[in-house]
Amino acid sequence: YTGKDALKDSNEARDFHRYAAQQFAQAGADFLYAALIPTLPEAIGMAYALAETGIPYIISFTIQADGCLIDHTPIADAIAAIDDLVSPAPVCYMTNCVHPGIVMQALLQPCNQAEIIHRRFLGIQANTSALSYAELDHAADLHSSDPETLADDIMKLRSIVPLRIFGGCCGTDARHMKAIAERITE
């Protein structure tokens, strides 16, 4: 999550991720999903590698409450850069392994008050803990919220962006997914 091991150059990232993308394409994948992408250069390189397959794909960023990827690139700027550089562009963008409360803080930052967020940022795979990555990395105990609280938090997030993809990540189980599904269909 820190981005310290992320590839620093988009061409290097494209070359690194190309083999896996091509293997999934040759295996007949319906779509490709790149998760936990912490930096813009890695996201661009990943997008190039996935776009080369011709298969629809999604990029999912690692984001922080300040509204940025781990490398301090605002989410709106990262989306705009990839959409401008890579063809075909991702189907959409999302985030994973983060609590919806942190995502709400991130998307409400001035740097992300852009139409592109509302049009292109469409999903979350949520953690149940509202702690930051750094806090979770050093936590001695499992932190979790109950299913109804997580579903409420996702619905609050959905009130500011038109989320269409929902899933769980760290700390979630079938109870959390059921609560989210019930709230979406109300």
Task: Explain the meaning of each model-derived region.
Residues Y1-E186:
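Domain-level signal for soluble alpha/beta catalytic cores
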